[in-house]
């Protein structure tokens, strides 16, 4: 049985309550001479939409403050401001980039790392920790003022004091401090103030820049960087951690692997160098010395690869140097303002026994690297009878891979996350040679935009909010023909009213890539954010190779790999034309005449089956006579309906989608 309905008089109470509520609401906002107890002179705590506000957005906070202050705002119709297409890409114009570069040069002396305060045997641990905290706090305030006053963008830097303490201890214990940088952009990962701080602690300590992933550079590019750092009076070594474990075999192997890397391989192959070019470069840059043999000694034994973790209690056993022996911080910052010639002369006066620096441009092997470490430091060592080499670098430049390659097996876990290594470690390669591994530190440096930080691998790609600026930077650095040859896509060409040599936009690249890979959204459009993550990861890994040139060089002519790929493409096109082959059809161009004069046939589209067993939709009721006559003409059930099969509309009108 159904539910028993309530009698009609049961809703009288609700009707009276509803009437009383409506009556009170109607008289609440009307003036009346009658006496009433509802004065409406207080806050209405009984309303239903009462909410507690503990956090507001910037706009809501501004409007709420203006309402409390009794300020009213009136909309004004001002002049219209047109936003150009370049502003939507998130990239800077040429004038803006030049202005930011000038600001970077003017404020370079303020970009420093925190110093360890002076201490001696009478300093208590509590006093030392408090002094370190005070210096670290003042250093962070200085960087914040630099960002706010000069409107500059700094890379994310390490904000944990414990990691900087590990750096201080590594510098104190090391005879040679090695900065590991990425070969594609060495100046971004180089910290000049760290080199100054090493000389402040002890003039006998040596600075070396180890350019990792140097197999991504050509011989001409390595020579250009070697000459640049030689003018800067900085010792550099070209090295590849992944290729260092493989013996160098010959010229043909280098060319084959370099071509494979430029033709869509993401792994680094065997790296080698031209013997004739090496001998020529060594005759120009290197003094006459015996070249170390390339035979590698086994280092997998437990005695040769002894591992030791240095606890903090052993700090008193090491010889430490205070900042009183070296120049002050102001003097060091003043030296960086001067030219490189004056800087080298000041260093030569400070250390007259120092040799003239000569850099060579070939890739060194593992044994050559160890021999260079032994020959580089000839002064007084921190620990008698032992050469200590401290390795410092960003977490994603290959520091851990370098250590594992030198040791011959996996001694340090490889990770791209800052803070993976909590404490410095000492790794004995052989008797008398010790590697001191410092935790990965992200040091402050200048960048122009966040897109540059994402493309350099500093910011994680999976956590980016806006994919348009980084992909626009990739399109600006990588030519159109390289993108098309790498991914096998056809990017839409510019319109007739545009520059035919302009770089493709991010939307054009991501749309073509998404269509080719099948990355589509629920609405049938190419998934641009997903395509952007794949392209940016290929750019960071080196599949899309772009090498930043030294200052003063043209970035376009410095990309020899792009020029070689273009020449190969032109040669292949000429061969195809000679053989009489048809060239691959290009994507439909945005031609104004074709679009304007193209006439489409207007037709009606139906949904469903066109004909079933001889019946056509809209032909009316099928009688027995008509059915028999049609069946007599043939056997339609054996024709399968393939002759007049209905095509999908998206296939018929595919040319209208783009």
Swiss-Prot record:
Listed under GO biological process in this entry are: nuclear export; protein transport; ribosomal subunit export from nucleus
Q: Does the keyword Transport apply?
A: yes
- Modified positions (Phosphoserine) are 93, 97, 252
Record field: compositional bias (Basic and acidic residues): 277-288, 329-348
The UniProt GO MF terms for this protein read:
GTP binding; GTPase activity
- The residues that hold GTP are 212-215, 393-400, 437-440
Q: State the residue spans of region: Disordered.
A: 1-31, 250-355, 623-658
Chief site of localization: cytoplasm
Localization, per the record, is: Cytoplasm; Endoplasmic reticulum; Nucleus, Cajal body
Where composition is biased (Acidic residues), the residues are: 299-328
Q: Where is the composition biased (Polar residues)?
A: 263-274
Query: Pfam families from the entry?
Result: MMR_HSR1 (PF01926)
Domain of life, per the record?
Answer: Eukaryota
Comp. bias (Basic residues): 16-28, 636-658
Q: Which keywords does this chain's UniProt record carry?
A: Cytoplasm, Endoplasmic reticulum, GTP-binding, Hydrolase, Nucleotide-binding, Nucleus, Phosphoprotein, Protein transport, Transport
Q: Please describe what this protein does.
A: Functions as a GTPase. May act by mediating the release of NMD3 from the 60S ribosomal subunit after export into the cytoplasm during the 60S ribosomal subunit maturation.
Domain statement: In contrast to other GTP-binding proteins, this family is characterized by a circular permutation of the GTPase motifs described by a G4-G1-G3 pattern.
- UniProt-recorded name of the protein: Large subunit GTPase 1 homolog
């Amino acid at each position: 049985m159904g539910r028993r309905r309530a009698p009609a008089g049961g809703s009288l109470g609700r009707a009276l309550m509803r009437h009383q509520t409506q009556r009170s609401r109607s008289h609440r906002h009307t003036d009346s001479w009658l006496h009433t107890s509802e004065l409406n002179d207080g806050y209405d705590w009984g309303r239903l939409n009462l909410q507690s506000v503990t956090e507001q957005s910037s706009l809501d906070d501004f409007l709420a403050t203006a309402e409390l202050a009794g300020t009213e705002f009136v909309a004004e119709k001002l002049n219209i401001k047109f936003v150009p297409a370049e502003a939507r890409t998130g990239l800077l114009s040429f004038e803006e980039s030049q202005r930011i570069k000038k600001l970077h040069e003017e404020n370079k002396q303020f970009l420093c790392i925190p110093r360890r305060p002076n201490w001696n045997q009478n300093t208590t641990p509590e006093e030392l920790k408090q002094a370190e905290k005070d210096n670290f706090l003042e250093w962070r305030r200085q960087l914040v003022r630099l960002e706010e006053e000069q409107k500059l963008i700094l890379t994310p830097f390490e904000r944990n004091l414990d990691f900087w303490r590990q750096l201080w201890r590594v510098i104190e214990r090391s005879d040679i401090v090695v900065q590991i940088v990425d070969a594609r952009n060495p100046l971004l990962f180089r910290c000049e103030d760290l080199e100054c701080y090493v000389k402040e602690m002890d003039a006998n300590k040596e600075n070396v820049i180890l350019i990792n992933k140097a197999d991504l550079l050509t011989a001409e590019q390595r020579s250009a960087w070697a000459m640049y750092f030689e003018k800067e009076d900085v010792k550099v070594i070209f090295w590849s951690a992944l290729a260092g474990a493989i013996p160098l075999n010959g010229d043909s192997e280098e060319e084959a692997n370099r071509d494979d890397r430029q033709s869509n391989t993401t792994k680094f192959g065997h790296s080698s160098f031209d013997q004739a070019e090496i001998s020529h470069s060594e005759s120009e840059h290197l003094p006459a010395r015996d070249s170390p043999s390339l035979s590698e000694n086994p280092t997998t034994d437990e005695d040769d690869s002894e591992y030791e973790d240095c606890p903090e209690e052993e700090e008193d056993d090491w010889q430490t140097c205070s900042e009183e022996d070296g120049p002050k911080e102001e003097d060091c910052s003043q030296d960086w303002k001067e030219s490189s010639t004056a800087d080298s002369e000041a260093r030569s006066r400070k250390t007259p026994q120092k040799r003239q620096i000569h850099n060579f441009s070939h890739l060194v092997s593992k044994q050559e690297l160890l021999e260079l470490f032994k020959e580089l430091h000839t002064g007084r060592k921190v620990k008698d009878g032992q050469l200590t080499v401290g390795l410092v670098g960003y977490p994603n430049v290959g520091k851990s891979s370098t250590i594992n390659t030198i040791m011959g097996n996996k001694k340090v876990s490889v990770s791209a996350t800052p803070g993976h290594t909590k404490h410095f470690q000492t790794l004995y390669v052989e008797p008398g040679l010790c590697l001191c591994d410092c935790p990965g530190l992200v040091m402050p440096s200048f960048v122009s935009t966040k897109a540059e930080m994402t493309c350099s691998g500093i910011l994680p790609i999976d956590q980016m909010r806006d994919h348009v600026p980084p992909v626009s930077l990739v399109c600006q650095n990588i030519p159109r023909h390289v993108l098309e040859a790498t991914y096998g896509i056809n990017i839409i060409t510019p319109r007739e009213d545009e520059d035919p040599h302009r770089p493709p936009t991010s939307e054009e690249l991501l749309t073509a890539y998404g269509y080719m890979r099948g990355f589509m959204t629920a609405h049938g459009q190419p998934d641009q954010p997903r395509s952007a993550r794949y392209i940016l990861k290929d750019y960071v890994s080196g599949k899309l190779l772009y090498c930043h040139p030294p200052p003063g060089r043209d970035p376009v002519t410095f990309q020899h790999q792009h020029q070689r790929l273009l020449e190969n493409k032109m040669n292949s096109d000429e061969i195809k034309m000679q053989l009489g082959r048809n060239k691959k059809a290009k994507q439909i161009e945005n031609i104004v005449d074709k679009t304007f004069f193209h006439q489409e046939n207007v037709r009606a589209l139906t949904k469903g089956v066109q004909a079933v067993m001889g019946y056509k939709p809209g032909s009316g009721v099928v009688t027995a006579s008509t059915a028999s006559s049609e069946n007599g003409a043939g056997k339609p059930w054996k024709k399968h309906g393939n002759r007049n099969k209905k095509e999908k509309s998206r296939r018929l009108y595919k040319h209208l989608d783009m």
